Amino acid sequence: MTRIKICGITRMEDARAAALFGADALGFNFSPESPRCVTKDAARTMVCALPPFIEGVGVFVEQDPREIIEICRYCGLSVAQLHGSRYSEEETKLVLEGVRVLKVFRPETDFTPAAVLRFREATGVSAFLFDTYRPGMEGGTGEQMEGSLAERIFSGLPEGCYGVLAGGLNPGNVREAVQSLRPYALDTASGVEESPGIKSHEKMQAFVQAVRAAGER
C-alpha cells in the first residue's frame, strides 16, 4: 500500500484531520524561510496529540546536524527530511546518530538512480524523496516532475531503497502518479492547501481517497 505524507502542517486541527483521513506521516517544517515554518513547541504539541503509529517528520533546509537531532528529540519526530547541498555523506552520518533520515534529491534531467545507490552505500540511508528541480528552490515548487525523468528514477531504484514522490501532487493527478510509478510513498503540501500552511480538509480527504483507490487496481 502506498504511504502518504502530508507536509507543512501548522495547525492542530489540520494534524488531527490528516490523521483521521488516513495519512501515514505528517511533515513539520523548521526552515525559518518557509511560510509553513512552525516552532518547536507547536510541533511538539501536535505530535503528542497524534494517534499511535503515525509518524512525525521534521523538514530541515541547510540546518546544523546537532540542531536537527535536538529538535527531533524534543518534538518526538522519528524522521529528519534533509533538503540542501549541505548534507554530504559525512553531514548525513552525523544526523543519523540521532534520527532516521529521508534524503531529498531534486533531480535534473541527467540524474540517474546510480546516485541513490552511491549515497546509500556511503551512509546507510534507504529512504529518498524526489522533488521537482527549480533553481534557487529547495522544494515547494508546486510543480510535477517531468514524466520520463520520474519514470526513469522510480523504475531504476536499487533494491532496498524506498522512493517518495513529491512535487505538484494533488487529488486530481495523484491517482495517475501511483499507477504509473508505484512509489513507496507520496508527499503533498500545497496540493491540499487553501493557502500556505492552511490545509483544506476536503482536499486532504480527497487526496487520501484517490491514493487508496489507485492502489486497489
UniProtKB/Swiss-Prot annotation:
The keyword Cell division does not apply. GO terms for biological process: L-tryptophan biosynthetic process. Its EC number is 5.3.1.24. Keywords: Amino-acid biosynthesis, Aromatic amino acid biosynthesis, Isomerase, Tryptophan biosynthesis. It catalyses: N-(5-phospho-beta-D-ribosyl)anthranilate = 1-(2-carboxyphenylamino)-1-deoxy-D-ribulose 5-phosphate. Pathway: Amino-acid biosynthesis; L-tryptophan biosynthesis; L-tryptophan from chorismate: step 3/5. SUPFAM superfamilies: Ribulose-phoshate binding barrel (SSF51366). One of its GO terms (molecular function) is phosphoribosylanthranilate isomerase activity. Belongs to the TrpF family. This is N-(5'-phosphoribosyl)anthranilate isomerase. It comes from Chlorobium luteolum (strain DSM 273 / BCRC 81028 / 2530). The gene is trpF.
